[in-house]
Amino acid sequence: MKVLMFGWEYPPHVFGGLATANYGISQGLHAQGDMDITLCLPKPFGDEDRSACQIVAMNAVPIAYRDVSPEYVRERVGNIMDPDLYFRLRDHLYADFNYMHVNDLGAMEFAGGYPGNLHEEINNYSIIAGVVARTLDYDIIHAHDWLTYPAGIHAKQVSGKPLCIHVHATDFDRSRGKVNPTVYSIEKNGMDNADCIMCVSELTRQTVFNQYHQDPRKCFTVHNAVYPLPDEYQAIPRPDHTGKDKVVTNRRSEERFSRNDE
């Protein structure tokens, strides 16, 4: 199976927990032996582990035509993406985006991480996804968290392929209930258009169909995996905590505060 995966960060450049989760999922799917993963990242740096997936640098995907040579493309983006892919992508431009802020390759730059203009970058990412979706061959679309839901929706609209979104957290979790209406709208739109919703916990799954009004039949709990400890760590003797006597020493709060006031 060929997977077109949209992510926002990837080790070793970790801005949050999403990078680690994305890496683990990519490695886990690759280990199945029958998965071909293409991972789209807004700003890869070239030192990412590519053993489990091919990486598409979204900041090197043209959305406007530029007459450039293979040598120039290799010099500019050869360290982050296969230069031949640039020309394949350029053959699938679907609109004239010269009015946008594009560079000498006809591509848009990304700050990386979570900049102040995050919503603008999310929109730009989804525009670029349209070129990628028209170029590559894939069977299913996997979008990680709300940042990439618009890109996943665009790819589904272009290809008709099923969309699986991965809910690592909802804005109800991140904001402790003080939900940003713009973020909520993006999240709900992603869920409404998804064929499958993967939730990292049963609590998240309950939030998805209670707060976002989704059909429970398309919501699945898929817990994050853990790496087993190496044998040398498991062999370390553990302290014996079978004793009954416990001694706890501390000063009373009143005493501590009264001394601080002196």
Show where each model-derived region lies:
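A short beta-strand/loop micro-motif in the catalytic core of glycosyltransferases
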Residues: 141-142, 193-201
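Carbohydrate-associated surface elements
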Residues: 203, 225
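Conserved donor-binding/catalytic core segment of Leloir-type glycosyltransferases
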Residues: 239-254
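Active-site proximal beta-strand in glycosyltransferases
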Residues: 3, 140-142, 149, 153-174
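Membrane-proximal helix-turn-helix segments that form the acceptor-binding/catalytic region
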Residues: 130-135, 157, 180-197
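A conserved catalytic-core segment of Leloir-type glycosyltransferases
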Residues: 28, 34-133
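Conserved small/polar residues in nucleotide/adenosyl-binding loops
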Residues: 255-262
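Nucleotide-sugar donor phosphate/pyrophosphate-binding loop at the beta->alpha transition
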Residues: 118-128, 162-164, 172-189, 228
